[in-house]
Amino acid sequence: VNRMLPLLGFLVVAALFGFGIYWTVQHNPREVPSPLIGKPAPAFSLPQLDQPARHVTRDQLLGKPYVLNVFGSWCAECVHEHPVLMAQAQRLGVPLIGYNYNDAPADATAWLARLGNPYAVVLADETGQTAIDFGVYGAPESFLIDAYGVIRYKHIGVLTPDVINDELLPAIAALPRGTP
């Protein structure tokens, strides 16, 4: 029996390891459902990146659906996503609004000047406070918000052409028509 204990211990560890791998494969952390889906977007008032004296509020954006894209000049994945946004922004059929997260405005402005600006407007959140209200884990993340200000879709990670074609565009097409 004493000689079986090491083997039994090994089998338990191997089983736990195997379960961990299985669970990780089955539960993609990018598919974490947001508790905000179907709920009004949090209230916010954020300065525009290019005109800090001008603030944009959630209520000013009511009446038209839009995609809110969270990015930062410090974000390596955002560099991969950016050419896709440059190429696909017009295809969305709704405004693409940039949400610059935890970033120095000068860095974000230089980043957009270098890579191009696909956004209708860019909001600046240097401290990341509003991001907490949106449940942002990091960048990039994207939200589809309908004309009534309700969050209809959230994507954690890079928006690829496949994600845009297979998820975001169908979500936009499914939005209720009309204005509030």
Each language-model region and where it sits:
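Aromatic-flanked redox-active Cys/Sec active sites in thiol-based oxidoreductases
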Residues: 69-75
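A short beta-strand-turn-helix
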Residues: 44-67
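N-terminal targeting signals for export/organelle localization
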Residues: 1-47, 180
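Hydrophobic beta-strand anchors of alpha/beta hydrolase catalytic cores
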Residues: 67-68, 96, 142
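Thiol/disulfide oxidoreductase modules built on the thioredoxin-like
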Residues: 113-118, 125-176, 180
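Structural microenvironment flanking redox-active thiols in thiol-disulfide oxidoreductases
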Residues: 79-116, 126-132
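Short gly/ser/thr-rich secondary-structure transition/capping motifs
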Residues: 26-28, 47-53, 122-125
